[in-house]
C-alpha cells in the first residue's frame, strides 16, 4: 500500500491540534514545528494517549539523535531518522482521498455484521460496523466484482465519513455457497502467517498479505456476504499464478522466493502461490496443501506444487536463505535458465544478513505473530530488542521500521517512504492504524480504554492488551495466545523445515525404518505429479512430443523418495514388463537395466506390493527376469510366495491389492511342488508338501474349481506316501 493510502491524523504531543497546511498563513510543510507532533491513527482513542504523553517528549528527543541507518531498497543512501519522520508527516498532511470525487459519504449508511478470523486459534469473531457501499461495481474479474466502500471506525464519536477508510467490497458474480466466503478468508489469513514467518528470516524485502474479513448485510434481501479489504493504490501485478510462474516485464525475486520458502519452511506440507498485489503487499493468494482438500477448489495439492517448481528458477534470495533448488532434468533446467536470465534484471540487492530457512538463529518475537512454528527453532524465544539497528526499509508495507518496536510501547504507528515503498511495523501486532497491518493474524476485542501498563517488559517488549479497534478488520494481538494453547490447537502443523532437493530428502528417509519410509515423502509425491504432467502433455506445446526423458528422471526421483507407484513402475519398465505408468516409454534391454529393474521390484516387494512379491518369487523360482547378479533360489521363492499369500492388509503405500492377479490355490500348489521335488537350495519336505496341496485343494473348491481340487488332493496323497517310504 502506498503512503498516500494511509489515512491518519496528526495530533500534538500535548493534546493540541496540528496546524493544517494552507490555513492561517502557515503552510510551510517543512516547518520545524513538525517536531512537536507524532502520527496517531484515527482508530486510536485519544484518551489512551494521556497515559504515555509524559514519555513521548523524552522518547522523541532521543529519536532525533538516533544514528543514520541503511536501506536495502537503496543501500547507497542513508537517511537520518528524524528526516524520515518529517517526510512521513509531510506525506500525511498532503494526502488526498482518491475516492473523494465519488462522494461515498452521500450514500445511505448500512449496518453490517463483520466476521473476522483468528488464524491462531481458528476462531471467528463477529461485531457490528457501519459502511457506505457504492451501488455499482467499479471493477470486475473472472469470478468477482468489486464495490467502492467506506467503513466507519467504531471509535469515532461522530460519523465523520469523509475521513473514513477506503475499502473494496468483493462478491462472487455467480452465486456460491456461503462457506466459500469464509474459506477464502481463512486461506488468506493462513497465508499471512507464512508471510510473517518469511519476514522473520530477514529477507532483503519483506512481504505482507492483506487483511480480509467478511461483512454480512443483514438489511438486504438474502443477507448477502462480501469480502472486505483495504483499498490499495498502485500497479497491480500478478507475480506467479495458481499453476506456475508468470513471465512479466516487471520481474521480481521476492514473490518467487516467498513461495519457495513456504514449501521448505512448512516441511513440504504446503506452498503459498498465486502471488499478486501492489509491490510486496499481496492479496488473493492460493495455498496448495499435501492433501489438496483445504482452501477451496483452487487447492491443487501436490500437482500445484509440481506446477510451481517446473517453472521456478531459484534466485539470489533463495540462495541467501538456504533454499535448495528443486531437482529438474537437464532439458527442464535449460528451459528454466531462460527465466534465470530474466531475473538478472531484478534490482533487489542482498544485505548478507538473511537467515537460512529453519535456522535455529531465527527467533520468534513474542507478540509479533501467532506462535506458529515456534517450537521448531531451537533458540526460539524473545529477541533482545536492545539492538534495533535498522538494516533496511523494505518495499513492503509489512516491513519493520527502524524503531518500530520501541515506538510500539508508546502506541505509535510508524510510517516511512523510500523509493515509493511504504514500510510499516511488521513485528508487533498491537500497532493500530488505518493502514494495512502486517503482523496481525489474530482479531482484537473492540472495547475501549482498557490499557495495560505501557512500560516495556523484559527483553524490551510490550505485551499491551489494548482493546482498540484495529481497522484492519481481522486481527489483533496474538501475544495473548500462549504457546502451549496454540500447540494444542495446531499440533499437526508443527513440522521441521525440509529442503527441496532429493539428495537431502533421501538422507532423511534413510534414517527411517522401511515402513516409515514408503509413501511418506511429500517431495516424492511432487516428483510423481511431474511425471503425470509430462505424460499428459501439460509441459509441451500442442503437437509436440512430450519429454519422456524428463518423465523418467522424475519417476526415478519419486522412487528414490519412497513412492511405491514409482518403484513398481520403474521395476516393470527396466525389466521389460508391461507397466501402466509411462506406458509408452520403453528402455533399452541391458544387464544394467535388468539389475535396476529387479532391485526396484525387490524394494517394492519389501514395501508390501503383492504384485512385486509374486514377480520376485517367480524370478527366483524359474530364473526368468532375474537380474544377472542373482541365481535361482527356491528358498527365496518360497519366502516371497508365502509373503504374498499372507498379504491381506494394505501395502506401505496405503493401497489394498487382492488376490485377483494370482489365485491363492495356484501359489499354494507351486509351493507344494517345490517342496515335493526340492532343489536350488530348498530341501525336500513331503509332509509340508502334502499339507500345502490340501490347502490348495480347499482354495480351489472355494473358487469353484472342483476338478482341479481333486488333482490337488491326489498329489497330497502322493506326497504323504513318499513320506512314509
UniProtKB/Swiss-Prot annotation:
Q: Which gene encodes it?
A: EEF2K
GO molecular function annotation = ATP binding; calcium ion binding; calmodulin binding; elongation factor-2 kinase activity; protein kinase activity; translation factor activity, RNA binding
* PANTHER family (UniProt xref): EUKARYOTIC ELONGATION FACTOR 2 KINASE, EUKARYOTIC ELONGATION FACTOR 2 KINASE-RELATED
Outcome (variant: residue 366 to A): Decreased kinase activity
Question: Where are the Phosphoserine residues found in this chain?
Answer: 18, 27, 61, 66, 70-72, 74, 78, 243, 359, 366, 392, 398, 435, 445, 470, 474, 477, 491, 500
This protein's assembly is summarised as: Monomer or homodimer. Interacts with Calmodulin/CALM1; this interaction is strictly required for phosphorylation activity.
Query: Domain of life of the organism in this record?
Result: Eukaryota
Residue positions, PTM N-acetylalanine: 2
The name under which this protein is listed is Eukaryotic elongation factor 2 kinase
Biased composition regions of type Low complexity, renumbered to the chain: 363-377
In its UniProt record, which GO terms are filed under biological process?
cellular response to anoxia; cellular response to brain-derived neurotrophic factor stimulus; cellular response to calcium ion; cellular response to cAMP; cellular response to insulin stimulus; myosin II filament disassembly; negative regulation of apoptotic process; positive regulation of dendritic spine morphogenesis
Q: What catalytic reaction does the record list?
A: [translation elongation factor 2] + ATP = [translation elongation factor 2]-phosphate + ADP + H(+)
Chain residue ranges for the region called Calmodulin-binding: 81-94
List keywords of the entry alphabetically: Acetylation, ATP-binding, Calcium, Calmodulin-binding, Kinase, Nucleotide-binding, Phosphoprotein, Serine/threonine-protein kinase, Transferase
Amino acid at each position: 500500500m502506498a503512503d498516500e493510502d494511509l489515512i491518519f491524523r496528526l495530533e500534538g504531543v500535548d493534546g493540541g491540534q496540528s496546524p493544517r497546511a494552507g490555513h492561517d498563513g502557515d503552510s510551510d510543510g517543512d516547518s520545524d514545528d513538525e517536531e512537536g507532533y507524532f502520527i496517531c491513527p484515527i482508530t486510536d482513542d485519544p484518551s489512551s494517549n494521556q497515559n504515555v504523553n509524559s514519555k513521548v517528549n523524552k522518547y522523541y528527543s532521543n529519536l532525533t539523535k538516533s544514528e543514520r541507518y541503511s536501506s536495502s531498497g537503496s543501500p547507497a543512501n542513508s537517511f537520518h531518522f528524524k528526516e524520515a519522520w518529517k517526510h512521513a508527516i509531510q506525506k500525511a498532511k498532503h494526502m488526498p482521498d482518491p475516492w473523494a470525487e465519488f462522494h461515498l459519504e452521500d450514500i445511505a449508511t448500512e449496518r453490517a455484521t463483520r466476521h473476522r478470523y483468528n488464524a491462531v486459534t481458528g476462531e471467528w469473531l463477529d461485531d457490528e460496523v457501519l459502511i457506505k457501499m457504492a451501488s455499482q461495481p467499479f471493477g470486475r474479474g473472472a469470478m468477482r466484482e468489486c464495490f467502492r466502500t467506506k467503513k466507519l471506525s467504531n471509535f469515532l464519536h461522530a460519523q465523520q465519513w469523509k475521513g473514513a477508510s477506503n475499502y473494496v467490497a468483493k462478491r462472487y458474480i455467480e452465486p456460491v455457497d456461503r462457506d466459500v466466503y469464509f474459506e477464502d478468508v481463512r486461506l488468506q489469513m493462513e497465508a499471512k502467517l507464512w508471510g510473517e514467518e518469511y519476514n522473520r528470516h530477514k529477507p532483503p524485502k519483506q512481504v505482507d498479505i492483506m487483511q480480509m474479513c467478511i461483512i454480512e448485510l443483514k438489511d438486504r434481501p438474502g443477507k448477502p456476504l462480501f469480502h472486505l479489504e483495504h483499498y490499495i493504490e498502485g500497479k497491480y501485478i500478478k507475480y506467479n499464478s495458481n499453476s506456475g510462474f508468470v513471465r512479466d516485464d516487471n520481474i521480481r525475486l521476492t514473490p518467487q522466493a516467498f513461495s519457495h520458502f513456504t514449501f521448505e519452511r512448512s516441511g513440504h506440507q504446503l506452498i503459498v502461490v498465486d502471488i499478486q498485489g501492489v509491490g510486496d503487499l499481496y492479496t488473493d493468494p492460493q495455498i496448495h496443501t499435501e492433501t489438496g482438500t483445504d482452501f477451496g477448489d483452487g487447492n491443487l495439492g501436490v500437482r500445484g506444487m509440481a506446477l510451481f517448481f517446473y517453472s521456478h528458477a531459484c534466485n539470489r534470495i533463495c540462495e541467501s536463505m538456504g533454499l535448495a533448488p528443486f531437482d529438474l532434468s537437464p532439458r527442464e533446467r535449460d528451459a528454466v535458465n531462460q527465466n534465470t536470465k530474466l531475473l538478472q534484471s531484478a534490482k533487489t540487492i542482498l544485505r548478507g544478513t538473511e537467515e537460512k530457512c529453519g535456522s535455529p538463529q531465527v527467533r520468534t518475537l513474542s507478540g509479533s505473530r501467532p506462535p506458529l512454528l515456534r517450537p521448531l527453532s531451537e533458540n526460539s524465544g524473545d529477541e533482545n530488542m536492545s539492538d534495533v539497528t535498522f538494516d533496511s526499509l523494505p518495499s513492503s508495507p509489512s516491513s519493520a521500521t527502524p524503531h518500530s518496536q520501541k515506538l510500539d510501547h508508546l502506541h505509535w504507528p510508524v510510517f516511512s517512504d523510500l523509493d515509493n515503498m511504504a514500510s510499516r511495523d511488521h513485528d508487533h501486532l498491537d500497532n493500530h492504524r488505518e493502514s494495512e497491518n502486517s503482523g496481525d493474524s489474530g482479531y482484537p476485542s473492540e472495547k475501549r480504554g482498557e490499557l495495560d501498563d505501557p512500560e516495556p517488559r523484559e527483553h524490551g517488549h510490550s505485551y499491551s492488551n489494548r482493546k482498540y479497534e484495529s481497522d484492519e478488520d481481522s486481527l489483533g494481538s496474538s501475544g495473548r495466545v500462549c504457546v502451549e494453547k496454540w500447540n494444542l490447537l495446531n499440533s499437526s502443523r508443527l513440522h521441521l523445515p525440509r529442503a527441496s532437493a532429493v539428495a537431502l530428502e533421501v538422507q532423511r528417509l534413510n534414517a527411517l525404518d522401511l515402513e516409515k519410509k514408503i509413501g511418506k515423502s511429500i517431495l516424492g509425491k511432487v516428483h510423481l505429479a511431474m511425471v503425470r504432467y509430462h505424460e499428459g502433455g501439460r509441459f509441451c506445446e500442442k503437437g509436440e512430443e512430450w519429454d519422456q526423458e524428463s518423465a523418467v528422471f522424475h519417476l526415478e526421483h519419486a522412487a528414490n523418495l519412497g513412492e511405491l507407484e514409482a518403484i513398481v513402475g520403474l521395476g516393470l519398465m527396466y525389466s521389460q514388463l508391461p507397466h501402466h505408468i509411462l506406458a509408452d516409454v520403453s528402455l533399452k534391454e541391458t544387464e544394467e537395466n535388468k539389475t535396476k529393474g529387479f532391485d526396484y521390484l525387490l524394494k517394492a516387494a519389501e514395501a508390501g506390493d503383492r504384485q512385486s512379491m509374486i514377480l520376485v518369487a517367480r524370478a527366483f523360482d524359474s530364473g526368468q527376469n532375474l537380474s544377472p547378479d542373482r541365481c535361482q533360489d527356491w528358498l527365496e521363492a518360497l519366502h516371497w510366495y508365502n509373503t504374498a499369500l499372507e498379504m491381506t492388509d494394505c501395502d506401505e503405500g496405503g493401497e489394498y491389492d487382492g488376490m485377483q492377479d494370482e489365485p491363492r490355490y495356484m501359489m499354494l500348489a507351486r509351493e507344494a511342488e517345490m517342496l515335493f521335488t526340492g532343489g536350488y537350495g530348498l530341501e525336500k519336505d513331503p509332509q509340508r508338501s502334502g499339507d500345502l496341496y490340501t490347502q490348495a485343494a480347499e482354495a480351489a473348491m472355494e473358487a469353484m474349481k472342483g476338478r482341479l481340487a481333486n488333482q490337488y488332493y491326489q498329489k497330497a496323497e502322493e506326497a504323504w506316501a513318499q513320506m512314509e517310504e
